[in-house]
């Protein structure tokens, strides 16, 4: 059995290591991540994780692990900002409000698919112009759903969360461990 991580995210690799799991291969899938018309955040996130898992080429006994993280402000999906201007708009919209961070995990082995979605609540403070401009200049927003990374500089902007911290980062470990175990992946092994 080979474990394939369908993600280029170094954060997901780091989180997997906390379970004593090292992927044998890293094969990020290339799928269309555009939301469908009228699609709500949670079904959107679950669909992307499943589509990513289906898109990774794997043998019948290989295990594919994929995830998708989405930031939702009400019914609005805030994906990865295209540029600093969009990141600024996201951060201003999130400021002073609670929002949801949804991470969907999909594990595939052969024709079997195991899935979970984890929804966490996050409150971001209103950012001053200095904070906003410094954060944008850091570049940390690039490639991050909602335009921020809670485990980085943006941690200073988050006074409150409810839910899974690792889910907000991008891979909810409790749920991921359950799914990997269901697929037969041994957990909690020390690195060789």
Curated annotation (Swiss-Prot):
Keywords: Cytoplasm, Hydrolase, Nucleotide metabolism
Gene3D superfamilies xref list: 3.90.950.10
Entry keyword Cytoplasm: yes
Pfam families membership: Maf
Feature type site, description Important for substrate specificity: 11, 69, 151
Cofactor or coenzyme needed: a divalent metal cation
GO MF: dTTP diphosphatase activity; UTP diphosphatase activity
Localization of this protein: Cytoplasm
CDD domains (alphabetical): Maf
Active-site residues per Swiss-Prot or TrEMBL entry: 68 (proton acceptor)
InterPro entries: ITPase-like_fam, Maf-like
Keyword presence, Hydrolase: yes
Enzyme Commission code: 3.6.1.9
Coiled-coil features, chain-numbered ranges: none
Major localization listed first in the record, in broad terms: cytoplasm
Signal sequence bounds: none
GO CC, any one term: cytoplasm
One BP term from GO: nucleotide metabolic process
NCBIfam families: maf
Family affiliation: Belongs to the Maf family. YhdE subfamily.
Protein name as catalogued: dTTP/UTP pyrophosphatase
Organism: Cereibacter sphaeroides (strain ATCC 17023 / DSM 158 / JCM 6121 / CCUG 31486 / LMG 2827 / NBRC 12203 / NCIMB 8253 / ATH 2.4.1.) (Rhodobacter sphaeroides)
């Amino acid at each position: 059995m080979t474990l394939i991580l369908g993600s280029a995210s170094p954060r997901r690799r780091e989180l997997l290591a906390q379970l004593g799991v090292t992927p044998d291969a890293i094969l990020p899938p290339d799928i269309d991540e555009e939301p469908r018309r009228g699609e709500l955040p949670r079904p959107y996130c679950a669909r992307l994780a499943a589509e990513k898992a289906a898109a990774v080429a794997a043998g019948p006994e290989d295990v594919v692990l994929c995830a998708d993280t989405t930031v939702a402000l009400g019914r609005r999906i805030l994906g990865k900002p295209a540029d600093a201007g969009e990141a600024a708009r996201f951060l201003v919209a999130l400021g002073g409000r609670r929002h949801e961070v949804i991470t969907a995990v999909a594990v595939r082995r052969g024709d079997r698919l195991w899935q979970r979605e984890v929804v966490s609540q996050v409150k971001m403070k209103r950012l001053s112009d200095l904070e906003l401009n410094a954060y944008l200049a850091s570049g940390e927003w690039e490639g991050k759903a909602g335009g921020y990374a809670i485990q980085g500089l943006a941690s200073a902007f988050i006074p409150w969360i409810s839910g899974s911290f690792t889910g907000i980062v991008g891979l909810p470990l409790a749920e991921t461990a359950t799914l990997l175990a269901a697929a037969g992946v041994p957990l909690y092994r020390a690195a060789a």
